[in-house]
Amino acid sequence: DNLICDSSYNLGKRTHNGLSEYGREVVKEMNRVGVMVDISHVSDDAFYQVMDVTQVPAIASHSSCRHFTPDWERNMDDDMIKRLAENGGVVQINFASYFVDQASKDTKAPIDADVAKYIKDNNLDPTDYASYDEYRREQYDKRFLYVSSEKVADHIDHVVNLVGIDHVGFGSDFDGVGY
């Protein structure tokens, strides 16, 4: 969570139950000055509250369809995609394997847990990425389920079938997700 809204990654107690009052003002100001509101990373409650506040189309710059990853709040469910389309917005499909395929997502958590254990067992600083990157890469190369472009296309087709081609785009997240 931050000062603006709750995060989809915070699975514990949410700070604002969606948007904070400050967040509502931020959305209004973004509308006023012509800045697009990006709802990737926000909690479901924050998403719907942004949709209620914004007067211009919003985007999900790098999200995918929860239809294929049911327990992944970071992705959008069908009702959210419909609401975003009603707003004139676009969902830009994230290419990361664990965003587009549940089986891939299921391989990620055990690897991440093993990497965390490696960091702890070797007294490494978790913020010193270089100190454990080689180990992390080895683990992902051996154990992670990478998916094909067909899985990404399934998400695109799902959005097109749900709300039309005008409301889907590409949002690779390649600068932050390499698998």
Task: Annotate each language-model stretch with its function.
Residues 93-98, 163-179:
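Short acidic/histidine-rich active-site segments
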Residues 3-15, 26-33, 59, 64-65, ...:
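Active-site-proximal beta-alpha loop/turn segments in soluble metabolic enzymes
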Residues 77-135:
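Aromatic-lined glycan-binding groove of carbohydrate-active enzymes
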Residues 1, 35, 40-47, 63-66, ...:
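Active-site beta-loop-alpha junctions enriched in small/polar residues
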Residues 10-59, 73-89, 150-166:
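Histidine/acidic residue-rich metal-binding segments in metalloenzymes
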Residues 128-154:
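Intrinsically disordered, low-complexity acidic Ser/Thr-rich regulatory segments
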Residues 50, 70-72, 102-104:
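Short, well-ordered secondary-structure micro-motifs
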Residues 90, 94-96, 140-149, 159-162:
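Extended C-terminal subregions enriched in glycine
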